[in-house]
Amino acid sequence: MKLDLKILDARMRDYMPAYATTGSAGLDLRACLDAPVTLQPGETTLVPTGLAIHLADPGYAALILPRSGLGHKHGIVLGNLVGLIDSDYQGQLMVSTWNRGQTEFVLNPFERLAQLVIVPVVQAQFNIVDDFAQSDRGEGGFGSTGRH
């Protein structure tokens, strides 16, 4: 799949989104910062990437997801948990960054911060019904299928 990418900050030419391995699902996104940013515990900030994409095809969307190492080791996750980039969005990719950890975290310029995953999208149409066809699960949820 070819994707239109606009470089909004010339410095990002040296830090293009890339797959870390041939098996990677996510492209690494980096913090386009002029100076380090310190996040105190519980603090959130919006971090620019210096990049914009245009998917154009409504059959696709992009997800901005946290990097597992930052979340596990430092408590750095996305403030909105998942960022959804619609196919018609053309603005800068921004990463809502939340320090849910117990200690301050310093985010350095051009540090890998999040990952971008391209996913297929189905735009559903609704069929209004009075009742659903019976299923084994029915309305059971929140652990109704068992613990193990």
From Swiss-Prot:
The keyword Cell inner membrane does not apply. Its EC number is 3.6.1.23. The keyword Magnesium applies. It comes from the Bacteria. Its cofactor is Mg(2+). Substrate binds at residues 67-69, 80, 84-86, 94. InterPro entries: dUTPase, dUTPase-like, dUTPase-like_sf, dUTPase_trimeric. One of its GO terms (biological process) is dUTP catabolic process. Pathway: Pyrimidine metabolism; dUMP biosynthesis; dUMP from dCTP (dUTP route): step 2/2. GO terms for molecular function: dUTP diphosphatase activity; magnesium ion binding. It catalyses: dUTP + H2O = dUMP + diphosphate + H(+). Gene3D superfamilies: 2.70.40.10. This enzyme is involved in nucleotide metabolism: it produces dUMP, the immediate precursor of thymidine nucleotides and it decreases the intracellular concentration of dUTP so that uracil cannot be incorporated into DNA. This is Deoxyuridine 5'-triphosphate nucleotidohydrolase. It comes from Burkholderia ambifaria (strain ATCC BAA-244 / DSM 16087 / CCUG 44356 / LMG 19182 / AMMD) (Burkholderia cepacia (strain AMMD)).
